[in-house]
C-alpha cells in the first residue's frame, strides 16, 4: 500500500540514481567543475526525486502528472550532463551505460506512474 511518496517504486529507483550520481560527482569530477557541470548534474538529479515528492503531495491528479513530467525532463537533462561528462573524459563508457540504464528504468517507471494516475483520475463531470 502506498502511503507516502517514499513507498513509490519510481521514487526508490530514482533516489538510488541520485545517490549514484552524487558519489560519481564527488569522486570523478575535477574541482574546476564544482560550480559548472558538477553543480548542474547534481541539481538535475535532485530535481527528479524532488518533483516526484512534490507531485505526490498535490491534491489533483493532473498536478501530480505535471510534476512527473517535469521529473521526466530532469531525467533526460541528467543524461545529457552525463554524456557531457563522458565527452570530457570524467567518466568512462561503462559508467555512462550503467547510469543510462538506470535513467531508462526511471523513465519507464515514471511513464507507468503517469499512466496509472491518468487511469485513476476521476472523469470530468458532464454539465
Task: For the regions a language model picked out, list residue spans one by one.
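Amphipathic alpha-helical assembly/interaction segments
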Residues: 1-127
